[in-house]
Amino acid sequence: MKIRNSLKSAKVRDKDCRVVRRRGRVYIINKKNPRMKARQG
C-alpha cells in the first residue's frame, strides 16, 4: 500500500479504483488490481 499526500492522481490510474473512508482515513481500493491500494497520509 502506498501512502500519498494526494489521492487524486492515484484514483485516475485505473477505472476500477474506489475512494473509501475508514476510521477517518481516505483509502483507494481496487478489487481487480490490488496493487493500486493507497492511503492518504
Curated annotation (Swiss-Prot):
GO terms for cellular component: ribonucleoprotein complex; ribosome. GO terms for biological process: translation. The keyword Disulfide bond does not apply. Keywords: Ribonucleoprotein, Ribosomal protein. One of its GO terms (molecular function) is structural constituent of ribosome. InterPro entries: Ribosomal_bL36 (IPR000473), Ribosomal_bL36_sp (IPR035977), Ribosomal_L36_bact (IPR047621). PANTHER family: 50S RIBOSOMAL PROTEIN L36 2 (PTHR47781), LARGE RIBOSOMAL SUBUNIT PROTEIN BL36B (PTHR47781:SF1). Belongs to the bacterial ribosomal protein bL36 family. This is Large ribosomal subunit protein bL36.
